[in-house]
Curated annotation (Swiss-Prot):
Record PROSITE patterns: ER_LUMEN_RECEPTOR_1, ER_LUMEN_RECEPTOR_2
Organism of this sequence: Xenopus laevis (African clawed frog)
Protein's recorded name: ER lumen protein-retaining receptor 1-B
Stretches of the chain found on the membrane's Cytoplasmic side: 25-32, 80-92, 136-149, 200-212
Biological processes, Gene Ontology terms: protein retention in ER lumen; protein transport; retrograde vesicle-mediated transport, Golgi to endoplasmic reticulum
Site (Important for recycling of cargo proteins with the sequence motif K-D-E-L from the Golgi to the endoplasmic reticulum): 193
MF (Gene Ontology): ER retention sequence binding; KDEL sequence binding
Keywords, comma-separated and alphabetical: Cytoplasmic vesicle, Endoplasmic reticulum, ER-Golgi transport, Golgi apparatus, Membrane, Protein transport, Receptor, Transmembrane, Transmembrane helix, Transport
Length: 212
């Protein structure tokens, strides 16, 4: 495992911890898109169906368990534990416009036409756009809490570091996964505007807002 993947995993874990602590400590999921969290739960479920059949390392298996468990814990807190604080009026992105096209694409463009491989490919495509409901929600409300901004920034850094991970693997391992690279590029591009606002506003102590 190279340093970029390790740092990417740390950034991803940081994002998860930030989100879970934000919801649990404030006893509120206000400002958090339940739809994005549902999409992430679908992403990790379909990606790690090989959890009990394909052992690579303790680290790898542990990360899979953490991602799946934390995604469902987040969904549970939003739609059950703290349901009264969920802002469904602003979380209105039509997720079927993300799920259906990525599902179709996973059947058309994949590495191997087998159930597990198609589901893995679907998870890669879906993850690249899963944050859109959250960004759409921030755009509709006009602002985001600072802690929510930290969560989004950590997620964006995770994806950016994973792009460097693919570059490193191509350079030193001659491993090239076009599907993962293109999906990662799409996801990173979606965060670009947010990165700019985060650096120019949040890091200067101002509240983040996206243009409506």
């Amino acid at each position: 495992m190279n340093i970029f993947r390790f740092l990417g995993d740390i950034s991803h874990l940081s994002a998860i911890i930030i989100l879970l602590l934000k919801i649990w400590k404030s006893r509120s999921c206000a400002g958090i898109s339940g739809k994005s969290q549902l999409l992430f739960a679908i992403v990790f479920t379909t990606r790690y169906l090989d959890l009990f059949t394909n052992f690579i390392s303790f680290y790898n298996t542990s990360m899979k368990v953490v991602y799946v468990a934390s995604s469902y814990a987040t969904v549970w807190m939003i739609y059950s534990k703290f349901k009264a604080t969920y802002d469904g009026n602003h979380d209105t992105f039509r997720v079927e416009f993300l799920i259906v096209p990525t599902a179709i694409l996973s059947f058309l463009v994949n590495h191997d036409f087998t159930p597990l491989e198609i589901l893995w490919t679907f998870s890669i495509y879906l993850e690249s756009v899963a944050i859109l409901p959250q960004l759409f929600m921030v755009s509709k409300t006009g602002e985001a809490e600072t802690i929510t901004s930290h969560y989004l920034f950590a997620l964006g850094i995770y994806r950016t570091l994973y792009l460097f991970n693919w570059i490193w693997r191509y350079q030193f391992e001659e491993f090239f996964d076009l599907i993962a690279i293109v999906a990662g590029l799409v996801q990173t591009v979606l965060y670009c505007d947010f990165f700019y606002l985060y650096i120019t506003k949040v890091l200067k102590g101002k509240k983040l807002s996206l243009p409506a």
